[in-house]
Amino acid sequence: MMMAALGSGIDVASLSITYNGAYTDYGMVTMSDGARYRLLAFTSSGTLSIEQPVNCEVCIVGGGANGNHGVGGAGGYLKNQAIADYSGGAVVVSAAQGASSIGGVSVNAVSGESGGTGGGGHNDVWGPGSGDGKSKYPFDDDSYEFWAGKPHCAGGAGGGYFSANNGKYAGGNGGTDGGSGGGATEGSPNGGTGGVYGGGNGGIGSSYGQNSGSNATYYGSGGGGYGDGNGVTGSNGSGYQGIVYARIPVIQ
């Protein structure tokens, strides 16, 4: 991400930065591109104030979708973008199925099975969702230590399905890293496995209960779909909130 230079004289490490929501200032870090940045992560909405205008890069993650009709919820959208001459303002960190934003840059909200990453299917009627095919690692950096092996925005899995008249279907697995969800397969009423990282698992298709989808557990990931056993259903799992990152390069 290229930005026009602001010129020398900005000491990024000692720059005064305040925020009235929940956030973490990791200080100066070296990321996988070998460059040094001041890294910030915002986990609730608030107002950001930076002592001097800076060039920075942001990563915006929307909330994941809830499971729906036994289908896994979609993972949220993720967007990386450079912002020049930025001194702060409103930061919106969305709950499940919401849109996050910073500096006039935002991502769309998701609901249902399709979005940033697809949710798994439930049966032959309620199929899987599709993803957008884009990396779900902040700043396209899949090896940085804070999130290595943890792509954001995983899809939730589909719940299992059992019907005395229409057979058994195992719920499809949730998608990972911008991929589509898996389709349901005949033969078993088991729930699918949530996508990596933190997508909710699908519920079991059982008429004896224990068939609710599980909630997502990582930023932007979708909830698992309920299991359906002869019309006995549990609840769909909930999607997980979004997050917003900002990194300020030491070289301005």
Spell out what each predicted region is:
Residues 3-12, 17-49, 55-252:
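Low-complexity, glycine/proline-biased repetitive segments and flexible coils/loops
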